[in-house]
Amino acid sequence: MADENTPVMPEEVPAVEGVGM
């Protein structure tokens, strides 16, 4: 689920591709 650009659980940054949830 973790993208190469986005962290596993982005808390400070909004979910770009809905990775946060």
UniProtKB/Swiss-Prot annotation:
Keywords from the UniProt entry: ATP-binding, Cytoplasm, DNA-binding, Isomerase, Nucleotide-binding, Topoisomerase
Record's subunit section: Heterotetramer, composed of two GyrA and two GyrB chains. In the heterotetramer, GyrA contains the active site tyrosine that forms a transient covalent intermediate with DNA, while GyrB binds cofactors and catalyzes ATP hydrolysis.
Gene Ontology molecular functions: ATP binding; DNA binding; DNA topoisomerase type II (double strand cut, ATP-hydrolyzing) activity
Name of the protein this chain belongs to: DNA gyrase subunit A
Leftover remarks: Few gyrases are as efficient as E.coli at forming negative supercoils. Not all organisms have 2 type II topoisomerases; in organisms with a single type II topoisomerase this enzyme also has to decatenate newly replicated chromosomes.
Gene Ontology CC entries for this record: cytoplasm
Enzyme kind, highest EC tier: isomerase
Function as written in the Swiss-Prot or TrEMBL entry: A type II topoisomerase that negatively supercoils closed circular double-stranded (ds) DNA in an ATP-dependent manner to modulate DNA topology and maintain chromosomes in an underwound state. Negative supercoiling favors strand separation, and DNA replication, transcription, recombination and repair, all of which involve strand separation. Also able to catalyze the interconversion of other topological isomers of dsDNA rings, including catenanes and knotted rings. Type II topoisomerases break and join 2 DNA strands simultaneously in an ATP-dependent manner.
Localization per record: Cytoplasm
Originating gene: gyrA
S-S pairs: none
Reactions that this protein is recorded to catalyse: ATP-dependent breakage, passage and rejoining of double-stranded DNA
EC number: 5.6.2.2
Family: Belongs to the type II topoisomerase GyrA/ParC subunit family.
Coiled-coil region list: none
Span list, region Disordered: 1-21
Species: Streptomyces niveus (Streptomyces spheroides)
